[in-house]
Amino acid sequence: LPPMLEALMGYPVATTGLVTAPSGVGTMVAMLIAGRLVGRMDVRMMLLAGFLVSAVALYQMMGYTLVLSQSDIVWPGVIQGVGLGFVFVPLSAVTFATLAPELRADGTAIFSLMRNIGSSIGISVIQAQVTRNTQVVHASLVEHMNPANAALVQNYDLSSPTTLESLNRMVTQQASMIAYVDAFKLMFIATLCVVPLLAIVRSRRRAAGEDAPHVAMD
C-alpha cells in the first residue's frame, strides 16, 4: 500500500506514514483483546474471525481508484489491522500449545524463521504480479491510443511529443492502479482459500486450573 500511495497518489513519505499508521493501531488493539481471549474460546473461531475481517478489508481495497480520500485508505487499513491481530495471536498460541517447555526456545526461532520466509515470499509474489500486470495492462490500453481513435484525435494533438508523454503518464497511472487492484483481489482470494484449512487445526482446551498458554511473538 505505501508504494501505491507514494507513486500513484503523490503522497509524501510523512503523509503515507500517517494514513497507514491506524492499521498498526488496529493490530495492536486486536492483539491485546485476542491475548485475553486465548484459552477462553476456540482458537479456530478466532482465526476464522481474523481471516474474514481481513478479507472484508481486502474486498474494500479492490474498489480503489486514482481518486481516493484519506478516509478511504484509513478505514480499510484499520479493519485489516484488526483482522491480522486476531490471526497472529491465536496462530502463535496453536503453534506452542503442544510444544514441550524445553523446546519453546527452538520452536520460537523456527516459527519466526518460517513466518519471515513466508512473508518475504508473499511480498515478492505480489510485487512481481504488480510489475507484470502493469506492463500487460499498459500494453492493452495503448492499443486503443492511435490515430484511428476519433475521440482521441479530436481532444489531443498526437503529433506533439509533450502530449504523447502526458498520455503515456496517464496510461501508466491507470495501468498501475489496475495492477494494484488485481493484487488486492489475489490476496482476497488467498485469504478465503486459507479458511477451509482451519478444519485441520487442533484446538486444545485449557484444563481447570491450568494457566493460559503463553504466546511468543517477535
Model segments located where?
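Hydrophobic transmembrane architecture of multi-pass small-molecule transporters
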Residues: 110-203, 209, 214-218
